[in-house]
Regions:
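A boundary/linker detector
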Residues: 1-12, 16, 20, 115
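Rieske [2Fe-2S] iron-sulfur-binding domain
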Residues: 25-115
Length: 115
């Protein structure tokens, strides 16, 4: 899926039906790959950079989601580092984090805010 980049706006990147509950889906926004995670119990969508900072591979959307230290997280499928879904912070290395974007659901669409 590819969406056009619009500065300072909310951009429609996919439909809610395209997301898999408690799992990841990758989308492209301009030249940027973003991993989306949908938490149906709370109705939240999380948008993180899809590039694993330890391997430079675009694989975060394929990671396993769960709970570590009371935080919802995704584990990189390559080297297994855990990243907080809310902040993108690596739980094993405070110096490393994934980019994050504000995300929301609106009328069955998934929107990401561009800075």
């Amino acid at each position: 899926m590819t969406a056009q980049l619009k500065k300072d706006t909310w951009t429609d990147v996919c439909q809610l039906d395209d997301l898999v509950p408690e799992s990841g889906v990758a989308v492209r926004l301009g030249k940027t790959q973003i991993a989306l995670f949908y938490w149906p119990k709370t109705g939240e969508v999380f948008a993180l950079g899809n590039t694993d900072p330890f391997s430079s591979a675009n694989v975060i959307a394929r990671g396993i989601v769960g709970d570590v230290q009371g935080k919802r997280m995704v584990a990189s499928p390559l080297y297994k580092q855990h990243f907080c879904l809310e902040t993108g912070q690596c739980l094993e290395d405070d110096a490393v984090s994934l980019m994050t974007w504000p995300a929301r659901l609106e009328e069955g669409q998934v929107l990401i805010q561009q800075p």
